[in-house]
């Protein structure tokens, strides 16, 4: 029995036709199931990825050592939007006090990513911008004033509507960043955006590793020396990983 069927039966059993359900909230487990049942098939088909974890979808690595990653970007534990970007086989991530590779489904990390401009450029005092922001959000929390038996269908419809709204932007992003050179240009644009600098402080590190990958080694090392790290040990670990790229080649 699907999530929709289970919740539908619960509502049929607990609410009379004339009862007004004001608030309805899916549990975290139910939300995961709803997304897996109703959004994953669309995401996998439209973006050529597979679900690899709850709220995370990714492709296989391509010949350049890149893989698409789409995931939830949480506002809190009940509201989220989507983020989309790339994971790179040759770029590590910082995990606690260690700099490690992010090459498996379990350790996957989105090195460079974007969100809808309608989401981060919202202005609560501007009605049109607020409406655009609302179109980018999904939630496991729902308010309905009548016809409680249809609440799950309404949540599913709302999720699909948000995904449909964002899909063209996501698809255009991947078309516009399909090479390392195009990704570098995109990183430079994001570095001019205070919002992206705030939510993704690793952009400069990603840029350095891509430069090194493209054989611009002197510039990569020069730019690396300008990056501020939380401590010297982390910097040294990143530098060691950077130099190890001399021996890197995509495993395909």
Locations of the language-model features?
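Amphipathic alpha-helical segments
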Residues: 28-52
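Proline- and acidic/polar-enriched loop/turn elements at helix boundaries
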Residues: 54-56
